[in-house]
Regions:
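Bacterial N-terminal signal peptides
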Residues: 18-31
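Residue-level detector of intrinsically disordered/flexible regions characterized by low predicted structural confidence
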Residues: 6-9, 33, 325
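Generic secretory/membrane-interface signal
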Residues: 1-2, 25, 186
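Sec/Tat signal peptide C-region and signal peptidase I cleavage site
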Residues: 31-37
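N-terminal secretory signal peptides that target proteins for export/translocation
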Residues: 1-15
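Subset of outer-membrane beta-barrel
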Residues: 38-328
Length: 328
């Protein structure tokens, strides 16, 4: 069935449609703090979850790394939704070359919109002039849905919005890289390289914009060998909007134990505090992000991240615990 021109034109501007629907859900006139396409969630713990946004980060440790995160949206508002992410990765060697593989799943719900993504990841790690250079690729399967039956619209026959649940899927690609030299780390990735258009039912479609992610961090040693100060920053942009996060955290590590805390600031968006550490072999971190505009400080979002590393024996004896170069 051919697409109707008015519907196609309106949904081609899906960012504006999504914003309007969210404003209906989160009270008319109140500004939402979600940014970019719904498919790209801005996690507060970007520095701890690099495999979530950069496939080159998989396989940095000989251990099996398992991570999970839950993020709530706009506390106190009905149908504000939440995001769940889970991922696992590991390293392996082929001759004298180092590689990494991983898999992850993302489930994001907000208002009438639902996004799911399943991804397989591969990375190649190469020593280079006293540093480590890595390149990664990620195959994504996207599933999008809009439940128009939940929309409270004045005009029920508005062709811009579906009247029932519609869904669709598409294949996508992500590429990434990182450069690590001693205390300095630079990372970059590009999401939605395939620029897919997801068909929702017979009369609607959802184009997906590409998103560029750039991150950096530097470990500052102090007079105490156990305490480290770590400034980091990240830029996310879909070339029509952007978000910058600037983070400062302090970290205390002793043997296999870790305690950290810090502050994050996203100009014109939010301020956040987080704290975490190692509990019974599991790394756990909690953060609260409060909006400095729009919804206000009280309607922020909570975020919890868990991580566990399981030693593997892939033909080599790994008797010593390995400290990952991941953004800890």
């Amino acid at each position: 069935m051919a697409y109707q021109a008015p519907q196609h034109a309106l949904l081609a501007r899906h960012a504006f449609v999504r914003m309007a629907m969210m404003m209906l859900v989160l009270l008319v006139g109140m500004r939402t703090q979600r940014v970019f396409a719904q498919q790209d969630v801005a996690f507060l713990h970007y520095w701890r979850m690099e495999t979530q946004w950069n496939p080159a980060a998989v396989g940095q440790s000989p251990q099996l790394s398992i991570q999970g995160a839950v993020q709530t949206h706009a506390m106190g508002y009905e149908q504000a939704g939440s995001t769940m992410w889970a991922g696992a990765d590991m390293a392996f060697a082929m001759g004298n070359t180092q590689h990494g593989v991983g898999a992850m799943f993302l489930n994001d719900n907000i208002g009438l919109f639902s996004h799911k993504r399943f991804s397989l990841q591969y990375a190649y790690h190469q020593p280079w002039k006293g540093a480590t250079l890595a390149f990664g690729v990620q195959a994504d399967m996207l599933q999008e849905s809009i439940d128009g039956s939940k929309a409270d619209l004045g005009n029920k026959s508005d062709p811009a919005f579906p009247s029932a649940l519609v869904n669709g899927s598409a294949f996508d690609l992500t590429i990434g890289s990182y450069y690590q030299r001693k205390a300095l780390r630079l990372s970059a990735s590009y999401h939605h390289l395939a620029a897919p258009t997801v068909r929702l039912g017979e009369t609607h479609e959802l184009p997906i914009r590409g998103v560029l992610n750039v991150g950096t961090q530097y470990n500052i040693r102090t007079s105490s060998p156990l305490f480290t100060i770590i400034p980091s920053a990240m830029l996310r942009s879909d070339f029509t909007d952007y978000r910058i996060d600037v983070t400062l955290r302090g970290q205390y590590s002793f043997e296999n134990r870790l305690i950290f805390g810090g502050i994050n600031y996203a100009p014109q968006r939010s301020v956040a505090l987080f704290v975490g550490g190692t509990l019974q072999g599991i790394d756990i971190s909690y953060g609260y992000e409060a909006y400095t505009s729009g919804l206000g400080l009280g309607a922020g979002q909570h975020e919890i991240v868990l991580a566990y590393r399981l030693p593997l024996d892939l033909g080599r004896k790994q008797r010593n615990l390995h400290k990952s170069v991941r953004w800890l």
